[in-house]
Regions:
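Interfacial segments of multi-pass membrane proteins
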Residues: 53-60, 154, 224-242
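Helix-loop junctions and terminal segments of transmembrane helices
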Residues: 12, 16, 47-52
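Membrane-interface alpha-helices at helix entry/exit sites of multi-pass transporters
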Residues: 24-29, 44-46, 59-73, 80, ...
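Transmembrane helix-loop junction
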Residues: 20, 39, 55, 187-191, ...
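Transmembrane alpha-helix interface/packing and boundary motifs in multi-pass membrane proteins
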Residues: 33-42, 202-223
Length: 274
Protein backbone atom coordinates (compact mmCIF):
# COMPACT_ATOMS: atom_id res chain seq x y z
CA UNK A 1 0.00 0.00 0.00
CA UNK A 2 2.71 2.61 0.77
CA UNK A 3 3.97 2.54 -2.82
CA UNK A 4 0.42 2.97 -4.08
CA UNK A 5 0.24 6.22 -2.10
CA UNK A 6 3.69 7.48 -3.08
CA UNK A 7 2.80 7.04 -6.76
CA UNK A 8 -0.06 9.52 -6.33
CA UNK A 9 2.12 11.90 -4.31
CA UNK A 10 4.72 11.97 -7.08
CA UNK A 11 1.92 12.48 -9.61
CA UNK A 12 0.73 15.51 -7.63
CA UNK A 13 4.26 16.89 -7.41
CA UNK A 14 4.67 16.51 -11.17
CA UNK A 15 1.35 18.20 -11.93
CA UNK A 16 2.22 21.04 -9.55
CA UNK A 17 5.54 21.46 -11.35
CA UNK A 18 3.75 21.64 -14.70
CA UNK A 19 0.99 24.01 -13.61
CA UNK A 20 3.18 26.35 -11.56
CA UNK A 21 0.05 27.36 -9.66
CA UNK A 22 -2.39 25.89 -7.17
CA UNK A 23 -1.85 24.45 -3.72
CA UNK A 24 -0.13 21.08 -3.54
CA UNK A 25 -2.69 19.82 -1.01
CA UNK A 26 -5.57 20.63 -3.37
CA UNK A 27 -3.78 19.03 -6.32
CA UNK A 28 -3.01 15.88 -4.31
CA UNK A 29 -6.58 15.55 -3.05
CA UNK A 30 -7.94 16.11 -6.55
CA UNK A 31 -5.84 13.16 -7.75
CA UNK A 32 -7.01 10.95 -4.87
CA UNK A 33 -10.59 11.87 -5.71
CA UNK A 34 -10.10 11.33 -9.45
CA UNK A 35 -9.18 7.67 -9.02
CA UNK A 36 -12.14 7.08 -6.72
CA UNK A 37 -14.45 8.75 -9.24
CA UNK A 38 -13.19 6.48 -12.01
CA UNK A 39 -14.34 3.47 -9.99
CA UNK A 40 -17.91 4.69 -10.49
CA UNK A 41 -17.63 6.20 -13.98
CA UNK A 42 -14.53 5.01 -15.88
CA UNK A 43 -12.26 7.84 -17.09
CA UNK A 44 -14.31 10.52 -15.32
CA UNK A 45 -11.52 11.22 -12.86
CA UNK A 46 -9.39 13.26 -15.26
CA UNK A 47 -12.14 15.83 -15.74
CA UNK A 48 -13.05 15.77 -12.06
CA UNK A 49 -9.55 16.57 -10.84
CA UNK A 50 -9.42 19.55 -13.20
CA UNK A 51 -12.76 20.70 -11.82
CA UNK A 52 -11.53 20.41 -8.23
CA UNK A 53 -8.43 22.52 -8.85
CA UNK A 54 -10.55 25.01 -10.81
CA UNK A 55 -13.03 25.30 -7.94
CA UNK A 56 -10.57 25.58 -5.05
CA UNK A 57 -7.66 27.46 -6.64
CA UNK A 58 -9.28 29.27 -9.58
CA UNK A 59 -7.00 27.85 -12.28
CA UNK A 60 -8.16 28.00 -15.90
CA UNK A 61 -10.12 24.81 -16.62
CA UNK A 62 -9.08 24.51 -20.28
CA UNK A 63 -5.42 24.87 -19.32
CA UNK A 64 -5.84 22.22 -16.63
CA UNK A 65 -7.34 19.79 -19.14
CA UNK A 66 -4.51 20.47 -21.58
CA UNK A 67 -1.92 19.78 -18.90
CA UNK A 68 -3.62 16.48 -18.01
CA UNK A 69 -3.56 15.42 -21.66
CA UNK A 70 0.15 16.24 -21.90
CA UNK A 71 0.79 14.28 -18.69
CA UNK A 72 -1.04 11.27 -20.07
CA UNK A 73 1.05 11.42 -23.22
CA UNK A 74 4.17 11.27 -21.05
CA UNK A 75 2.68 8.36 -19.11
CA UNK A 76 1.98 6.51 -22.34
CA UNK A 77 5.59 7.02 -23.41
CA UNK A 78 6.71 5.58 -20.07
CA UNK A 79 4.46 2.56 -20.58
CA UNK A 80 5.83 2.08 -24.08
CA UNK A 81 9.40 2.18 -22.76
CA UNK A 82 8.51 -0.40 -20.10
CA UNK A 83 6.77 -2.51 -22.72
CA UNK A 84 9.72 -2.37 -25.09
CA UNK A 85 12.08 -3.39 -22.29
CA UNK A 86 9.84 -6.25 -21.20
CA UNK A 87 9.23 -7.49 -24.74
CA UNK A 88 12.93 -7.48 -25.65
CA UNK A 89 13.72 -9.26 -22.38
CA UNK A 90 10.92 -11.83 -22.61
CA UNK A 91 10.01 -12.20 -26.30
CA UNK A 92 8.95 -15.90 -26.06
CA UNK A 93 6.56 -15.12 -23.20
CA UNK A 94 4.84 -12.31 -25.11
CA UNK A 95 4.51 -14.55 -28.17
CA UNK A 96 2.82 -17.23 -26.06
CA UNK A 97 0.60 -14.61 -24.42
CA UNK A 98 -0.60 -13.36 -27.82
CA UNK A 99 -1.22 -16.92 -28.96
CA UNK A 100 -3.12 -17.88 -25.82
CA UNK A 101 -5.35 -14.78 -25.83
CA UNK A 102 -5.85 -14.77 -29.60
CA UNK A 103 -4.53 -11.23 -29.92
CA UNK A 104 -2.53 -10.10 -32.93
CA UNK A 105 -2.22 -6.92 -34.93
CA UNK A 106 -3.10 -8.77 -38.10
CA UNK A 107 -6.35 -10.14 -36.71
CA UNK A 108 -7.44 -6.64 -35.68
CA UNK A 109 -6.49 -4.93 -38.93
CA UNK A 110 -8.01 -7.71 -41.05
CA UNK A 111 -11.46 -6.68 -39.82
CA UNK A 112 -11.19 -3.48 -41.87
CA UNK A 113 -11.91 -3.68 -45.61
CA UNK A 114 -10.23 -1.23 -48.05
CA UNK A 115 -13.55 0.58 -48.41
CA UNK A 116 -13.82 0.79 -44.64
CA UNK A 117 -10.38 2.37 -44.36
CA UNK A 118 -11.26 4.98 -47.02
CA UNK A 119 -14.60 5.84 -45.43
CA UNK A 120 -13.01 6.16 -41.99
CA UNK A 121 -10.17 8.35 -43.26
CA UNK A 122 -12.40 10.63 -45.36
CA UNK A 123 -14.93 10.99 -42.54
CA UNK A 124 -12.18 11.95 -40.12
CA UNK A 125 -10.76 14.56 -42.50
CA UNK A 126 -14.22 16.00 -43.20
CA UNK A 127 -15.09 16.27 -39.51
CA UNK A 128 -11.72 17.86 -38.71
CA UNK A 129 -11.99 20.43 -41.52
CA UNK A 130 -15.56 21.34 -40.56
CA UNK A 131 -14.65 21.75 -36.91
CA UNK A 132 -11.65 23.95 -37.72
CA UNK A 133 -13.72 26.15 -40.03
CA UNK A 134 -16.41 26.63 -37.40
CA UNK A 135 -13.94 27.35 -34.63
CA UNK A 136 -11.72 29.80 -36.45
CA UNK A 137 -14.16 31.52 -38.84
CA UNK A 138 -17.54 31.77 -37.15
CA UNK A 139 -17.86 34.52 -34.53
CA UNK A 140 -20.33 32.48 -32.49
CA UNK A 141 -17.44 30.23 -31.52
CA UNK A 142 -15.20 32.96 -30.11
CA UNK A 143 -15.55 31.54 -26.59
CA UNK A 144 -14.57 28.14 -27.94
CA UNK A 145 -11.45 29.70 -29.45
CA UNK A 146 -10.50 31.15 -26.08
CA UNK A 147 -10.91 27.76 -24.44
CA UNK A 148 -8.88 26.09 -27.16
CA UNK A 149 -6.09 28.59 -26.56
CA UNK A 150 -6.18 27.70 -22.87
CA UNK A 151 -6.14 24.01 -23.74
CA UNK A 152 -3.17 24.59 -26.06
CA UNK A 153 -1.29 26.45 -23.33
CA UNK A 154 -1.88 23.55 -20.96
CA UNK A 155 -0.84 21.05 -23.59
CA UNK A 156 2.55 22.67 -24.17
CA UNK A 157 3.21 23.64 -20.55
CA UNK A 158 5.29 20.47 -20.12
CA UNK A 159 7.87 22.06 -22.43
CA UNK A 160 8.04 25.08 -20.14
CA UNK A 161 8.68 23.42 -16.78
CA UNK A 162 11.36 25.14 -14.74
CA UNK A 163 13.18 21.90 -14.01
CA UNK A 164 12.97 19.28 -16.80
CA UNK A 165 15.22 16.93 -14.83
CA UNK A 166 12.83 17.07 -11.87
CA UNK A 167 9.91 16.38 -14.20
CA UNK A 168 11.67 13.29 -15.52
CA UNK A 169 12.54 12.21 -11.97
CA UNK A 170 8.89 12.49 -10.89
CA UNK A 171 7.75 10.57 -13.97
CA UNK A 172 10.18 7.73 -13.27
CA UNK A 173 9.24 7.75 -9.57
CA UNK A 174 5.53 7.42 -10.42
CA UNK A 175 6.01 4.28 -12.46
CA UNK A 176 8.66 2.83 -10.18
CA UNK A 177 6.18 3.20 -7.30
CA UNK A 178 3.46 1.50 -9.33
CA UNK A 179 5.80 -1.39 -10.12
CA UNK A 180 7.02 -1.74 -6.52
CA UNK A 181 3.40 -1.74 -5.35
CA UNK A 182 2.80 -4.69 -7.68
CA UNK A 183 6.11 -6.41 -6.87
CA UNK A 184 5.48 -6.31 -3.11
CA UNK A 185 2.19 -8.13 -3.72
CA UNK A 186 4.19 -10.79 -5.58
CA UNK A 187 6.15 -11.47 -2.39
CA UNK A 188 2.97 -12.10 -0.38
CA UNK A 189 2.25 -15.47 -1.98
CA UNK A 190 4.49 -18.53 -2.14
CA UNK A 191 3.38 -19.37 -5.67
CA UNK A 192 4.38 -15.93 -7.02
CA UNK A 193 7.40 -15.26 -4.80
CA UNK A 194 9.00 -18.41 -6.18
CA UNK A 195 8.77 -17.34 -9.85
CA UNK A 196 11.35 -15.09 -11.51
CA UNK A 197 11.23 -11.31 -11.19
CA UNK A 198 10.74 -11.22 -14.98
CA UNK A 199 7.20 -12.51 -14.40
CA UNK A 200 6.36 -9.50 -12.21
CA UNK A 201 7.57 -7.09 -14.89
CA UNK A 202 5.68 -8.81 -17.71
CA UNK A 203 2.48 -9.08 -15.65
CA UNK A 204 2.78 -5.42 -14.67
CA UNK A 205 3.23 -4.28 -18.27
CA UNK A 206 0.36 -6.40 -19.59
CA UNK A 207 -1.82 -5.14 -16.74
CA UNK A 208 -1.07 -1.53 -17.73
CA UNK A 209 -2.67 -2.14 -21.11
CA UNK A 210 -5.56 -4.13 -19.63
CA UNK A 211 -6.69 -1.17 -17.49
CA UNK A 212 -7.15 0.89 -20.66
CA UNK A 213 -10.42 -1.00 -21.15
CA UNK A 214 -13.11 1.32 -19.70
CA UNK A 215 -14.18 -0.77 -16.71
CA UNK A 216 -13.97 0.26 -13.02
CA UNK A 217 -10.26 0.11 -12.18
CA UNK A 218 -9.74 -2.32 -15.06
CA UNK A 219 -11.88 -5.00 -13.39
CA UNK A 220 -12.19 -8.06 -15.59
CA UNK A 221 -9.60 -7.44 -18.32
CA UNK A 222 -6.89 -6.82 -15.71
CA UNK A 223 -7.69 -10.04 -13.85
CA UNK A 224 -7.65 -12.04 -17.07
CA UNK A 225 -4.39 -10.52 -18.33
CA UNK A 226 -2.47 -10.97 -15.08
CA UNK A 227 -3.76 -14.52 -14.53
CA UNK A 228 -2.77 -15.47 -18.09
CA UNK A 229 0.77 -14.16 -17.63
CA UNK A 230 1.16 -16.04 -14.35
CA UNK A 231 0.02 -19.25 -16.04
CA UNK A 232 2.74 -18.78 -18.67
CA UNK A 233 5.29 -18.87 -15.86
CA UNK A 234 3.90 -22.09 -14.38
CA UNK A 235 1.44 -20.71 -11.84
CA UNK A 236 -1.84 -22.64 -11.76
CA UNK A 237 -5.02 -21.00 -13.04
CA UNK A 238 -6.61 -21.06 -9.58
CA UNK A 239 -3.57 -19.50 -7.90
CA UNK A 240 -3.34 -16.90 -10.66
CA UNK A 241 -6.99 -15.99 -10.18
CA UNK A 242 -6.50 -15.68 -6.41
CA UNK A 243 -3.50 -13.40 -6.88
CA UNK A 244 -5.28 -11.17 -9.40
CA UNK A 245 -8.36 -10.91 -7.18
CA UNK A 246 -6.28 -10.11 -4.09
CA UNK A 247 -4.17 -7.41 -5.73
CA UNK A 248 -7.09 -5.78 -7.51
CA UNK A 249 -9.18 -5.77 -4.33
CA UNK A 250 -6.29 -4.22 -2.41
CA UNK A 251 -5.85 -1.53 -5.06
CA UNK A 252 -9.56 -0.78 -5.12
CA UNK A 253 -9.70 -0.54 -1.32
CA UNK A 254 -6.76 1.87 -1.35
CA UNK A 255 -8.43 4.04 -4.00
CA UNK A 256 -11.67 4.17 -1.99
CA UNK A 257 -9.89 5.08 1.26
CA UNK A 258 -7.85 7.82 -0.42
CA UNK A 259 -10.99 9.13 -2.10
CA UNK A 260 -12.80 9.35 1.25
CA UNK A 261 -9.79 11.09 2.76
CA UNK A 262 -9.77 13.59 -0.12
CA UNK A 263 -13.46 14.37 0.35
CA UNK A 264 -12.91 15.04 4.05
CA UNK A 265 -9.80 17.14 3.42
CA UNK A 266 -11.41 19.22 0.67
CA UNK A 267 -14.44 19.89 2.85
CA UNK A 268 -12.05 21.66 5.25
CA UNK A 269 -10.16 23.50 2.50
CA UNK A 270 -10.86 27.16 1.88
CA UNK A 271 -11.79 28.21 -1.64
CA UNK A 272 -9.51 30.93 -2.95
CA UNK A 273 -11.35 34.16 -3.69
CA UNK A 274 -11.03 34.96 -7.38
Amino acid sequence: MPFGVTAQVFRALRWKLVLREGRLSVILNSIFLSYASSLVVPRSGEVLRCGVVRRYDGADFSRLVGSVVSERIIDMLMILLLTLSAVLWQIPVFVRFMQRTGLSLGSVLSRFTPAGWWVTALSGVLILCTALWLVWRVQLFSSVKARLRGFRDGLVCVKRVKSPSLFVLYSVAIWLSYYLHFWVAFQCFDFTASVSSDCALVAFVVGCFAVLVPTPNGAGPWHFAVKTVLMLYGVSADDGAVFALFVHTLQTLLVVLLGLYALAALSLTKIKIR
